[in-house]
A protein has these predicted regions:
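Beta-strand scaffold of nucleotide-dependent catalytic cores
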Residues: 166, 280, 348-352, 421, ...
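Short beta-strand motif preference
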Residues: 50-52, 165, 279-281
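N-terminal [4Fe-4S]-dependent radical SAM core
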Residues: 88-95, 115-163
Length: 489
């Protein structure tokens, strides 16, 4: 299925709604005459038209141009995208569970509408009628929004921020992964220089945060795989964090322990000793066959052993990640993984839906979305989490997620992941250290934002580190220039 779009300066809205039905279809804005197996969305001077054709069968919908936005109408881009959705829903018989919603933060949308004074009935109509969202997904989003409100009030207090520290090294690359990460064996020579620079950047963040009058709320060390560092390197990094920040005032300090093939008892003890209050051990699946399919070099038993080591080290707040839709997995296999995770009783279980990124080996090797038809049925098994006492506390979506589904963090009551909520709902400044880091400066409750980017690759981050430090001065400058007298208060 090819997607053709004409008559618009950008096909963004149409493309994303079409991809709800055909996630990996090629797109062109300059089409020839429609051929077999194509979707053609067109805006002309007189109206809108969408045609779908597969073989000898075709169907077309037409509509007049919408009223201008200032007269209560909508943009031609959105109107054509909506017409595309209506046609493809009729053509395929598929109703995407999130309807016409393509944004990654549906819960944020609920918060925004409530803040704008919308009634519950108005928000209901917005989701269920205008965007054709399923009642099940909308009710889950509302439940999460209700749970998040007191946490967001704390996190959105003036001049609070969270610190993210990125470790872009992994022992091997998983087949679904498209993140910038370095193979530890190949790039081991970069690790120590990288850690040295990272510690210096953490120190500079403390300086700039103090200049701006910011108060640290939470810390997250992610990756990559942070435990690909040696125990000594973890001590160096986490020691730098402890020396520069008052951890007694931090509400949450997370370290992704990640994979059991590089997480041992010594590293888990270091993480606990240096102040982390929450860790993540990420099995993705408890099937040895599926682990092999995705390139993991460890077994399900290794995950169980790592989890036991973490409990012995004194870790009392543990998250475990699972992924629905991994190659070779089945609904029954995913249910087994979910039941195994629940049996361990971690404080958090996060269920991701596989996302087909073009840089991942799954897509490169042409394992397309049709191989994963059971993913929605897998997510239906999450009722087991609710029955076991977990509740959903944050939700986000990504482009090209299988069947347009979502990622949901589940927690035992009182164990919500604060950093996850803050970064998803964009209420708080996030100061990022490390290669690929994206600092997000937030003011006025999210109404004003600015980003500061680090260099993407570890070798460039190391070689151009002086520029990294220079860019960090933009943190204090943002508050000095944008907040005026408040910046010195």
């Amino acid at each position: 299925m090819k997607i053709y779009i004409t008559g618009l300066p950008s096909g963004y809205e149409v493309e994303h709604l079409a991809r709800l039905f055909y996630p990996m279809a090629p797109l062109t804005l300059t089409p020839p005459e429609p051929a077999e197996d194509c979707l053609w969305a067109e805006k002309t001077d007189t109206g809108l038209r969408v045609l779908v054709r597969q073989g000898e069968k075709s169907k077309m919908l037409e509509a007049p141009l919408p009223l201008p936005v200032e007269q209560g109408g909508e943009t031609p881009e959105f109107a054509l995208a909506s017409l595309t959705y209506d046609l493809l829903r009729q053509w395929t018989g598929i109703r995407p569970p999130w309807g016409k919603m393509t944004g990654v933060r549906p819960v944020r949308l609920i918060h925004d509408k409530r803040a704008a004074g919308w009634s519950a009935e108005q928000i209901d109509r917005f989701f269920l009628q205008r965007f054709d969202c399923s009642e099940q997904k909308y009710e889950m989003a509302k439940e999460i929004a209700d749970l998040q409100e007191p946490i967001l009030r704390m996190g959105s207090a003036p001049k609070t921020y969270s610190l993210y520290i990125g470790i872009p090294f992994c022992p091997s690359r998983c087949s679904y992964c498209s993140f910038v990460s370095c193979n530890l064996d190949r790039d081991r020579k970069l690790v120590q220089p990288y850690v040295d620079c990272l510690c210096r950047e953490v120190e500079e963040i403390r300086v700039q945060a103090e200049r701006a009058g910011l108060t640290l709320c939470s810390i997250y060390i992610g990756g990559g795989t942070p435990t690909s560092l040696s125990a000594a390197q973890l001590r160096q990094l986490m020691g730098t964090v402890r020396e520069n920040f008052d951890l007694s005032k931090v509400v949450e300090y997370t370290v992704e322990a990640g994979r059991p093939d590089c997480t041992d008892a010594e590293k888990l003890a270091v993480i606990k000793e240096y102040g982390a209050t929450r860790i993540s051990i990420n099995p993705q699946t408890f099937s040895d066959a599926v682990l092999a399919n995705i390139g993991r070099k460890h077994s399900a038993q290794d995950i169980l052993d790592c989890y036991a080591d973490a409990r012995r080290a004194g870790h009392e707040d543990i998250n475990m990640d699972l992924i629905a839709g991994l190659p070779g997995d089945t609904v029954e296999g995913f249910e087994h993984s979910l039941r195994q995770a629940i049996a361990l009783q971690p404080e958090n279980i996060t269920v991701h839906t596989l996302t087909l990124k073009r840089a991942s080996r799954i897509v490169i090797e042409d394992q397309k979305e049709n191989d994963y038809a059971d993913v929605a049925a897998m997510l239906e098994k999450c009722h087991l989490l609710a029955e076991a006492g977990y509740r959903p506390y944050y939700l986000y979506r990504q482009k090209n997620t299988l069947q347009n589904l979502e990622n949901v963090g589940w927690c035992k009551p009182g164990h919500e992941g604060y950093y996850n909520i803050y970064i998803m709902e964009e209420v708080q400044t996030i100061l990022s250290a490390g290669a690929g880091g994206s600092t997000k400066l937030v003011a006025d409750g999210g109404k004003r934002m600015q980003r500061i980017f680090n260099f993407k690759y570890p070798n460039e981050y190391i070689q151009r580190f002086a520029e990294v430090l220079e860019r960090k001065k933009g943190v204090a400058d943002f508050y000095d220039h944008d907040l005026g007298p408040e910046a010195s208060g």
